[in-house]
Every structure is written in structure tokens, then in C-alpha cells.
């Protein structure tokens, strides 16, 4: 017996792009753009797709892959409840939803990285990131160096060998599954 995803036909949806959301997240108000995604459901069904791979969704500063809060939907897209309503509508139409969770790096505005910027070696999060070195300055002017995703220093790499990081990320996953 195969699992559902082995038979699934996925439609990839990049919500920030498909809805024309602003490129940078400087707004304070929430804009419900999930309603714009609702209209894509008949099209996705007409293609024979029965699953959507959507994301990134988490609160970020720009393109979505620079997460600043894993437990909030990006305010340029709506609220957590708006996303739940979109997911419910997908399920009512026989479409499963899989979220693109960006769990190997964060943005520079993520709470743990900001804490390191502020407290440096006294930060309890200094081991949450790969290659943190207080004897080196980052190309972006931080008083410490760190490993960055593909050399993009606005995307500091999480230390996935750190148990606290793993616990935190599993907590995030449980938050969204519940």
C-alpha cells in the first residue's frame, strides 16, 4: 500500500509572487491575500493536481526564505487563521496542502540571530547558528562571522546538530500540524 504523496500530483504555489505582494515586508497591517489564492483552486483541480506545495509562508523580511517568525504567516499574505481557511477550502476540494518549511536557515531578523547581534558571546543562542566566530566580522558588519546559505549572509545557517535548535523546529512543526 502506497502513501498518499506517492500518488499525489503537486502544484507548486509561491504565494508572495502569485498575489503580487510587496517585495519587502515593511507594512504593519495584515493584508489577506489568501482570498486571491482561492480562485486558483478550480484551475489546480482542472490540471489533475490533488496537492499543493505552498510557500514560503512564514513571516519574513523580503522573498520569504528569510524567516523572522516561524509561527506567524507573513503579514503580506494574511493571518494564521486566513491560511487555515485556505487549507480547509483546499481539503474540501480534495487537495492536500504541504508547506515549504525553510528550516536550514533564518533571516537576520529572527529572534535568535538578533539576540546574538545584541549580546554577542553572552547570547544563549550563539550555538544556534553554524560557524559563529567572534574573532571575525561578517560581510554585513556583524561583530562576528557565521556560515550563510550559499554565501548569502542575509540567510544565516542554523546549526541543525544543536539539540535546542532541533527541539525548537519540532515545536514549530507541531504548532502547524495541530
Model-derived features with residue positions:
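Substrate-binding/active-site clefts of carbohydrate-active enzymes
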Residues: 3-8, 14-50, 57-178
